[in-house]
Structures are given as structure tokens and as C-alpha cells.
Design a protein with these regions (language model features):
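The canonical Cys-X-X-Cys-His
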Residues: 1-5, 66
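Structural microenvironment flanking redox-active thiols in thiol-disulfide oxidoreductases
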Residues: 5-39, 50-56
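Nucleotide phosphate-binding site architecture
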Residues: 2, 12, 76
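Short gly/ser/thr-rich secondary-structure transition/capping motifs
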Residues: 2, 46-49
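Thiol/disulfide oxidoreductase modules built on the thioredoxin-like
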Residues: 37-42, 49-96
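Short, conserved active-site loop motifs that form the nucleotide-linked donor/cofactor pocket
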Residues: 18, 44-45
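Non-globular targeting/processing and membrane-anchoring segments
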Residues: 100-103
Length: 103
């Protein structure tokens, strides 16, 4: 999707400092691989959600969405829509501060 393409550089930047996991929602495997071939693969692991049910269960409403999940499983950031490097830095800082971790 165009918003996924737009945020790809920010996700790559994030993957240099934090583990990034991805969920492929409703894409054909060959389309997902073509995306990764074109934009690179920043993901440590990629889950597959072919019918979108798992994404709906965790509250995904639009693509892309970025979640930061604390070690205890709490969602401490849920950003809907593409996220860009300038937004990402502030969002991560705020999320880490909510855990008592100073940046």
C-alpha cells in the first residue's frame, strides 16, 4: 500500500535500535516478498494474517499501524496510519518514558 511504502524508511531506521516485528495482513506471499525485495526487510520476524482476523482482534483499523509493546505485553503506543522518522522518535521517547526509561 502507498502508506506502507511511505513509512518504510522510518521502520528501517527504527530496526537499527529496537527489534521490529511485522504482520503481513491479507497480502499474497509473492506480493509481500516483492515489497521486502524493493524496500528491504527490517523485521526480525513476520507473522501472517491472511484473513485479517488476528489484526482485527488486536484493534487494527487501517494499514499501516505501528504498535510499541512493553516487555509485559502492554501496548504503550498505537499509531494509526503511516509513521515518519520525525514522529517516530518522539513517539518512542514518550513510550519509553511511560515505562520509566529515560532517553
Amino acid at each position: 500500500c502507498p502508506p506502507c511504502r511511505a513509512e518504510a524508511p522510518a521502520i528501517h531506521q527504527l530496526s537499527k535500535s529496537l527489534p521490529v516485528l511485522g504482520i503481513n495482513q491479507r497480502d499474497k506471499p509473492q506480493d509481500a516478498m516483492a515489497f521486502l525485495d524493493q524496500f528491504g526487510n527490517p523485521y526480525q520476524q513476520i507473522g501472517v494474517d491472511p484473513d485479517g482476523k488476528a489484526s482485527i482482534a488486536i484493534g487494527v483499523q487501517a494499514l499501516p499501524e505501528t504498535l510499541i509493546i512493553a516487555p509485559d505485553g502492554r501496548v504503550i503506543l498505537h499509531h494509526r496510519g503511516p509513521i515518519f522518522a520525525n514522529e517516530l522518535h518522539g513517539s518512542i521517547r514518550d513510550a519509553l518514558n511511560s515505562l520509566g526509561i529515560d532517553q
